[in-house]
């Protein structure tokens, strides 16, 4: 395969497809690196603050690929040294350890959960200490603790108030999005991974935009928990690859399909070409978002396949060019660009991908996606 975008070039059609799909809501994002990189992480461990050894746990050697070791390491760092110290250590390990790089989003969930415990479940206090590193997982994890602390008896009457502070500060800002998305994760924990009950809880939110973001957290958690031995997902079916997306309300279908590709890839042995074909069978209005989901997964996989920006760009191009239609390829690149920015909280890797594309129209369209998405994240 050539370094450029299409051998199957169709004039300016790729650019035309790029021009609209940067408008996808920020909350419509990948199901994260967990399943794609075979890192299985299950429910949060809401560990109370303890007087543990202030020196971080050593997760090297035989524990170098032990998620529970790193989880405890960062929880202890939060309790003993603070959130800033935990992130400083995580960023250092991210640069050195491939396992940490691959599981970074869920490790930031752990930091967020511990921070919310430390700050008594107060959203403004917890968020004031936050960091967007590795896909804003800190804020999602924080909301898992907040929802758990409120409890099932009061959560529906309190749901609209949970994200009041970030909503009032700037409606639909990144903090507001992370709060609403995190509620979805929290509801799944509260209701024992019951997808439809958790979606009903999202439905208790007054704003349609918040409901959509919340549902994204629900679907992300559903995919993650497929192999959870203590509480496996009941809402994934190997013989119905699009379920539960086919059964949810229309307002929740896009957040579902964009994450469902992660599960579909696993069931197809990480064969992207086969999943491109499956996405082509999705109900018409949601076929494009399925391709965007594949782009998210392509970007996630690239962190495993390459260590340099150029390697990542090559890996993503190789995947997205498996799409047989212009729409499939262009939406895949859109998803990849957004996921790279989402993960790294900058546009360096995304721009490297865009600059590798040909023809010029495709490169320009890709750069527009990157520019607009960066602006959206900075609101």
PLM region descriptions:
Residues 38-379:
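Non-catalytic tandem-repeat scaffold regions and their flanking low-complexity/translocation tails
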Residues 26-42:
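Hydrophobic alpha-helical membrane-insertion segments, chiefly the h-region
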Residues 15-30:
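N-terminal Sec-pathway targeting helices
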Residues 10-11, 21, 49-50:
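Intrinsic disorder/low-complexity segments enriched in polar/small residues
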Residues 1-18:
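N-terminal Lys/Arg-rich, disordered targeting/topogenic segments
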């Amino acid at each position: 395969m050539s370094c450029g975008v299409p051998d199957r070039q169709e004039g300016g059609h790729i650019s035309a497809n790029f021009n609209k799909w940067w408008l996808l809501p920020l909350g419509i994002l990948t199901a994260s690196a967990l399943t794609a990189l075979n890192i299985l992480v299950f429910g949060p461990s809401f560990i109370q603050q303890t007087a543990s050894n202030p020196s971080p746990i050593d997760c090297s050697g035989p524990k170098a690929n032990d998620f529970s070791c790193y989880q405890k390491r960062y929880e202890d760092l939060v309790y003993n040294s603070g959130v800033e110290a935990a992130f400083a250590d995580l960023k250092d390990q991210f640069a050195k350890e491939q396992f940490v790089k691959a599981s970074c989003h869920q490790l930031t969930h752990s930091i967020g959960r511990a921070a919310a415990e430390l700050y008594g479940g107060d959203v403004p206090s917890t968020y004031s200490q936050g960091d967007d590193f590795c896909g804003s997982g800190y804020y999602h994890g924080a909301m898992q603790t907040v929802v758990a602390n409120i409890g099932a008896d009061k959560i529906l009457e309190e749901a609209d108030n949970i994200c009041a502070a970030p909503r009032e500060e700037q409606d639909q800002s990144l903090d507001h999005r992370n709060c609403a998305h995190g509620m979805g994760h929290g509801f799944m924990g509260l209701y024992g991974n019951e997808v439809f009950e958790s979606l009903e809880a999202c439905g208790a939110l007054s704003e349609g935009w918040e409901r959509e973001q919340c549902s994204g957290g629900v679907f992300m958690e559903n995919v993650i928990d497929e192999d959870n031995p203590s509480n496996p997902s009941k809402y994934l079916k190997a013989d119905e690859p699009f379920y539960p997306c086919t059964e949810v309300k229309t307002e929740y279908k896009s957040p579902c399909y964009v994450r469902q590709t992660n599960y579909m890839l696993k069931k197809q042995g990480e064969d992207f070409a086969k999943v491109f074909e499956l996405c082509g069978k999705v109900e018409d209005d949601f076929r494009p978002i399925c391709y965007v989901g594949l782009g998210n997964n392509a970007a996630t996989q690239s962190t495993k396949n390459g260590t340099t920006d150029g390697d990542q760009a090559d890996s993503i191009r190789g995947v997205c060019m498996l799409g047989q239609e212009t729409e499939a390829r262009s939406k895949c690149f859109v998803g990849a660009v957004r996921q790279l920015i989402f993960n790294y909280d900058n546009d360096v890797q995304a721009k490297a991908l865009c600059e590798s594309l040909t023809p010029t129209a495709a490169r320009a369209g890709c750069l527009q996606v990157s520019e607009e998405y960066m602006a959206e994240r900075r609101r």
